[in-house]
């Protein structure tokens, strides 16, 4: 509907600027943003990923796929990461991480739910708060 990724990102940038948005928070956003887009929003785009990056991350690692990979690998601990977004999938600077135990009877679904409840839902608001506080300080000092 937007005419491809470049047109989508152009329209999104215009809307974000028009609304004077200072922070973009992604959760379940399955589009890889371009280097041009992320460069316009340095240290202003947050993403939550359902693993302890650098484990089980990158292109194609999302949703249940992450938890399936963790269970296949036999890890005893997984978790979630909030990081800044750059042009590399899950490659931006890490802000916060929280570990979650993998239980012997876990399925991808039970693990996904526990990681969301015990890590993602706690980390993402806290990271947004930390970055927002920094943005406010920068604006006051400008």
Region spans (language model):
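One-carbon transfer enzymes
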Residues: 1-142
């Amino acid at each position: 509907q937007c005419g491809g990724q470049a047109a989508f990102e152009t329209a999104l940038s215009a809307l974000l600027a028009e609304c004077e948005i200072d922070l973009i928070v992604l959760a379940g956003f399955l589009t890889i943003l371009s280097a041009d887009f992320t460069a316009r929003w340095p240290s202003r785009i947050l993403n939550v990923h359902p693993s302890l990056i650098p484990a089980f991350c990158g292109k194609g690692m999302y949703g249940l796929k992450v938890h399936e990979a963790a269970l296949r690998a036999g890890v005893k601990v997984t978790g979630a990461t909030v990081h800044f977004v750059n042009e590399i999938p899950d490659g931006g600077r890490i802000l916060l991480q929280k570990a979650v135990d993998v239980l012997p009877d876990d399925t991808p679904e039970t693990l996904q739910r526990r990681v969301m409840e015990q890590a993602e839902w706690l980390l993402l608001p806290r990271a947004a708060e930390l970055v927002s506080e920094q943005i406010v300080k920068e604006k006051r000092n400008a």
